[in-house]
């Protein structure tokens, strides 16, 4: 099981959680990335699951194990050429986990994201002929789809992508996209249940004003 899959497994026992991915991407291909996994709306249930250590036969990582996984991410990401300002944080009062880093190319961005799940090497972001593309692959355990009794909870849980650029956006391929007034930020949100069943719902191709 990958590192942040371990954290998201807590969703099996939580009524609500939020995953927010933010990118500030510049024309020179550098940028800043952040990922927030937020269980604060159901912190009591999440804390109970962590304290039990096992629910419905599934092992729940301890707080110490979560800290270790975040530390391992920092170590792995620091070895990626072109990655910098790598940081993680955790809040065990509300169960909020964050990771942040900067990158000097999309290759570096992809390489850092691939340290989260070492079993696969994916191209998460690319730019072709001036079009910025996101090929979504969020680290949510596939086995959640088998938990039909959790469907309602997972429909309440949300994944949000917020991408900001230093030039104006002219169009976005995903019809669920919303734009800021400045036309430099695109927003996309879906519930976790739908994304589990179709990861492509979070895919997007973003074009810019010449």
Residue ranges and their predicted role:
Residues 14-15:
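C-terminal motif of bacterial Sec signal peptides marking the signal peptidase cleavage site
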Residues 19-37:
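One face of beta-strands
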Residues 36-44, 176-180:
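Short, solvent-exposed aromatic-acidic interface loops
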Residues 2-7:
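Sec-dependent signal peptide recognition
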Residues 40-64:
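Post-signal-peptide N-terminal segment of Sec-exported extracytoplasmic proteins
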Residues 74-210:
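Mature, soluble, non-transmembrane domains
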Residues 62-73:
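Beta-sandwich interaction modules
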């Amino acid at each position: 099981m990958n590192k942040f899959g371990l954290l998201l497994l807590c969703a099996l026992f939580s009524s609500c959680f939020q995953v927010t991915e933010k990118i500030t991407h510049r024309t020179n291909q550098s940028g800043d990335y952040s990922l927030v996994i937020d269980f604060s709306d159901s912190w009591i249930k999440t804390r109970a699951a962590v304290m039990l250590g096992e629910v419905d036969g599934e092992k729940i990582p301890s707080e110490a194990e979560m800290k270790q996984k975040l530390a391992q991410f920092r170590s792995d990401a620091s070895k990626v050429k072109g990655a910098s300002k790598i940081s993680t944080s955790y809040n065990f009062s509300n169960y909020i986990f964050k990771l942040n880093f900067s990158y000097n190319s999309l290759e570096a961005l992809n390489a850092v994201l691939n340290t989260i799940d070492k079993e696969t090497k994916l191209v998460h972001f690319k730019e072709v002929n001036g079009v910025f593309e996101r090929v979504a692959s969020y680290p949510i355990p596939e086995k959640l789809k088998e938990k039909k009794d959790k469907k309602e909870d997972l429909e309440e849980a949300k994944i949000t992508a917020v991408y900001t650029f230093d030039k104006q956006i002219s169009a976005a391929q995903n019809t669920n996209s919303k734009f800021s007034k400045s036309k430099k930020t695109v927003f996309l949100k879906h519930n976790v249940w739908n994304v589990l069943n179709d990861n492509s719902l979070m895919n997007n191709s973003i074009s810019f004003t010449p």
